[in-house]
From Swiss-Prot:
ATP binds at I19, G61, V62, G63, K64, T65, E66, D277, E341, R413. Belongs to the ClpX chaperone family. HslU subfamily. GO terms for cellular component: HslUV protease complex. It comes from Bacillus cereus (strain 03BB102). This is ATP-dependent protease ATPase subunit HslU. Keywords: ATP-binding, Chaperone, Cytoplasm, Nucleotide-binding. It comes from the Bacteria. Signal peptide: none annotated. Its main location: cytoplasm. One of its GO terms (biological process) is protein unfolding. ATPase subunit of a proteasome-like degradation complex; this subunit has chaperone activity. The binding of ATP and its subsequent hydrolysis by HslU are essential for unfolding of protein substrates subsequently hydrolyzed by HslV. HslU recognizes the N-terminal part of its protein substrates and unfolds these before they are guided to HslV for hydrolysis. The gene is hslU.
Length: 463
């Protein structure tokens, strides 16, 4: 966990990936820092302080989800994104709202398990190598000493058998030591070995996921695990690949799942972040049965956000200290259309602004994972160096902004569509091009995009 970041440091980290939206960054930075502050309080006071949930308001593609996702990744907190429209009111067929908490715990278990695997990696690899040695130099089958009843009485061939076994053991030990040295030196990496691996089987209960049956809070497959032994199958792999498979199996054996579960539930309860997208779609005044159902979903979400206990296969999970971040465009509705009780549970309101041409320019070049850097890296694998002139980047940004204005505003996602269209021919012919360096100019951008961008009807379908 990295809860020690100051709010300013958190904003600086988010700036590496997200352009603008200072208010949203400040809100999540303060929320994260308050978790650190809360952890330093006396226990009686700590229990009284719950996180202040955040409501983000802004059009699609401006960074609502990315702010929350990067925030969670920054501190290593369990994080899930759910869509409010996927849930149904209790009594209807569909996912119940408690499933979001169960999904959060599953994510937390996966994170903790991965951390534990890293800790036991060296020991697991050592044991995997030992298994490889035994596979490469197998033990001979011991002769049974009970073939002849007379031998049991008089010890007929027992001494000679023991002598033979002893000699074989010495020879095998020498061979294994030799193989062990070769393995350590990496001389046997391409050797093919036959190993037994646990077969991954899909459960028939997977069909029940998403139908409301998961509300029982348990995994049927786990419950029946003791009655349904795991199947194994033989696989022929190179020593290099077999080592990975065996290391993973040994790591799973070395991990204490009780410890994993305990830590995972703690992290989900104290550090978990649930991002509820499209919350505006379940807001609205009651006018028909559909709206009544939407209000029912809001009322079902309310106790989860307020703080309650949710049954999971890992035990009961308290939601009192989970941070909820809700988001929506609110084009057809207003935050005040949410039921008053739910409004009160999201005291921090943040409005994200629409992206300007200047924002698009920055998005294209400034973040660590900037789009232009991605395309340059992809084409570099074909031996082609491409560069974009400043004027070309400005032209791309202007076209993206204009298409957003003329059609649906999908924010920064428009850049993905435009960049794909711009470099479509280049990407197709890259493996056949003999030029080592190509410069993208405003004229090239104009040639590829301007005609489409100016034709509103065409741009609706292509850009």
């Amino acid at each position: 966990m990295h809860l020690h970041f100051t709010p300013r440091q958190i904003v600086e980290k988010l700036d590496q990936y997200i352009i603008g939206q200072k208010d949203a960054k400040k809100a999540v930075a303060v929320a994260l820092r308050n978790r650190y502050r809360r952890s330093k309080l006396a226990e009686n006071l700590r229990d009284e302080i719950a996180p202040k949930n955040i409501l983000m308001i802004g059009p699609t593609g401006v960074g609502k989800t990315e702010v929350a996702r990067r925030m969670a990744k920054l501190v290593g907190a369990p994080f899930i994104k759910v869509e409010a429209t996927k849930f149904t009111e209790v009594g209807y067929v569909g996912r119940d709202v408690e499933s979001m908490v169960r999904d959060l715990v599953e994510t937390s278990v996966r994170i903790v398990k991965e951390e534990m695997v890293v800790k036991v990696q060296d020991k697991a690899e050592e044991q995997a190598n030992q298994r490889l040695v035994e596979i490469l130099v197998p033990s001979p089958e011991k002769q049974s000493g009970f073939k002849n009843p007379l031998e049991m009485l008089f010890g007929g061939a027992q001494n000679s058998n023991q002598t033979t076994d002893s000699q074989e053991d010495v020879e095998i030990e020498k061979k294994r030591q030799d193989v062990e040295r070769k393995l350590a030196a990496g001389l046997l990496e391409d050797e093919i070995v036959s190993i037994e691996v646990t077969e991954q089987q899909s459960s028939m209960f997977d069909m029940l996921q998403g139908t409301g049956m998961e509300q029982m809070g348990m995994n049927f497959q786990d419950a029946l695990g003791s009655f349904m032994p795991k199947k194994t199958k033989k696989r022929k792999l190179s020593v290099k690949e077999a080592r990975k498979v065996l290391t993973n199996e040994e790591a799973q054996r070395l991990i204490d799942m009780d410890e994993v579960t305990q830590e995972a539930v703690y992290r989900a309860e104290q550090l978990g972040i649930i991002f509820i997208d499209e919350i505006d779609k379940i807001a609205g005044k009651q006018s028909n049965s559909v709206d009544v159902s939407r209000e029912g979903v809001q009322r079902d979400i309310l106790p989860i956000v307020e703080g309650s206990n949710v049954a999971t296969k890992y035990g009961s999970v308290k939601t009192d200290y989970i941070l909820f971040v809700a988001a929506g465009a609110f084009h057809m509705s207003k935050p005040s259309d949410l039921i008053p009780e739910l409004q009160g549970r999201f005291p921090i309101r943040v409005e994200l602004t629409k992206l300007s041409t200047d924002d698009f320019v920055k998005i294209l070049i400034e973040p660590d994972n900037a789009l232009i850097k991605q395309y340059m890296a992809l084409l570099a694998t074909e031996g082609i160096e491409i560069e974009f002139s400043d004027e070309a980047i400005r032209k791309i940004a202007e076209i993206a902004y204009q298409v957003n204005q003329d059609t649906d505003n999908i924010g920064a996602r428009r850049l993905h569509t435009i960049m794909e269209k711009l470099l479509e021919d280049l990407s197709f012919e890259a493996s056949e091009i003999t030029l080592e360096k190509i410069t993208i100019t405003p004229q090239y951008v104009e040639e590829k995009l301007a005609t489409i961008a100016k034709n509103k009807d065409v741009s609706q379908f292509i850009l």
